[in-house]
Amino acid sequence: MFSLQDLCRKNTFFLPNDFKKHTLQLLGLYWKEHGSVHRAEKDNIMIQNELILTVNDALQLAGEEGDTDVVQLLLLWEGNLHYAIIGALKAENYNLICEYHSQIEDWHALLPLIQDPETFEKCHELSLGCDLLCLLQHAIKCNMLSILVKYKEDLLNARIRHRIQSLFVLACETRRIEIILWIGQNLPIPEPETIFSIAVITKDLELFSLGYKIIFDYMQRQGIFQLSEVVRKILLNRHIDMAVNKGLLPFVLETFKYGGSVKRALSCAVMDNKRKVIDYLVRHENISHQTIERLLYLAVKKHSSRKTLNLLLSYINYKVKNIKKLLDHVLGGNSTLVLKILLEKKQNLVDAALTRLVKHSTYFRVKEFIEDFSISPEKFIKIAVREQKNVIIKVICEDIWENPAERIRYLKQIVSSIKYESGRQFLINIIHTIYQSHSLKPEEIFKLATFYVKHNAVTHFKDLCKFLWLNRGTESKKHFLKCLEIADEKDFPAIKSIVSEYINYMFTAGTMTKDEIMQAYASEYTMC
């Protein structure tokens, strides 16, 4: 069974206007000194069919009046008991508080609902075991500045003064602007810089700006927080680093208002690949070509991304004035990406870089560079010859051509393309060391001997003649005669003398006849 009272209390409908007070009391729908009360919709009630209140506002009013019957009714209508307790605290109706005390698990949960500081404190006092610090923490969370003002002297007391920093951090984290300002104006904050870290993490520009107001306007003026120019600069640089790292351009610009360095911001942006920051500052701060080149060196040194390098190069139209310094950073940091970008824009610094590498670096660096840029063996060898780097030529040639005969064959081709005599002789010397270190087939040695004759390599040819003499066959005789013919054509007397000497040996040994010798020299005289 159900009663008419239950039906009326649990449902939403309008009451008839002719219901008398006694009837309403029997139905449990009468509020002393207010009149009839019924549920108008889910979250509202109507008093005397005219005044509309939210259920929770009505609960707070009932709590102030200590009307437990109305409180029970409104709780049936899904009201929040906390509002009734708040009303009771405000009016100090402790009987109602005692009645519902056991239903409150944590008195701190009521604090955000309270607007009045006195009621706020009364409520907090009901949390057994809490101290002044706990009250101040919740005052900050609930933006109750007046409570902090009330306990200012306590905060300055040595017993709790060390807690100022944690309260300041809490105010920053909960973004209580008025409280932050008040703390900055009235209390000695041990580490006011915390506000900047929190502002950057939460991306709160207003909080970031407020930090400077506290440090430079309030604390420094009052002598609480002294900053020398050096410390001020360090502080601003740190803030720039944080802001750029997060890509927060407005924060970077804010530091400039207090003396932050544009160059510092650009350097950080380059290292962190923050292109939006770079682009804005370059376009709005009148950055010189020289400064951009310095940023480019930094980008190379720190291995910045392709997009960052491209952006910096675009500002100077891909034309670097101080190539030497750029190459210093490229090779010093083993960072060659910029060379590839310039090469794509028809700016070739690869040869210059390779020359520097060959001259000053190790075999491994040179090999890596050659492979990275697909440099032809001929180009590398010519540079190495110019720099007189015989060891590195030998080692890299061994990597390229494992077969010594093939190695000699390619090197001979390169010798023919070198235009200056000293370079040709240098490479011929290397070829000869390869010959000395390996056992070549006779036909390869014969070809090498002919090559030496063509380039008038007297000493090396003389060395090979020993092999030719030891192989006293018809093949050897033919090569001696061919060498004589070439030496005669090119007028190399030293070579001719060596060949003549070995022809005499062959004649003495019976390998060559008098007629063959006469025929060879007859050809010589005919040419003369």
UniProtKB/Swiss-Prot annotation:
GO CC term (a single one): host cell cytoplasm
Subcellular location: Host cytoplasm
Transmembrane intervals: none
Top-level taxon of the source organism: Viruses
Family: Belongs to the asfivirus MGF 505 family.
Free-text function comment from the UniProt entry: Plays a role in virus cell tropism, and may be required for efficient virus replication in macrophages. Interferes with host NF-kappa-B promoter activity mediated by TLR8. Mechanistically, inhibits the phosphorylation and subsequent nuclear translocation of host NF-kappa-B RELA subunit downstream of TLR8. Promotes the expression of the autophagy-related protein host ULK1 to degrade host STING and inhibit the interferon response. Also inhibits JAK1- and JAK2-mediated signaling and thus negatively regulates the IFN-gamma signaling.
Name of the molecule in the record: Protein MGF 505-7R
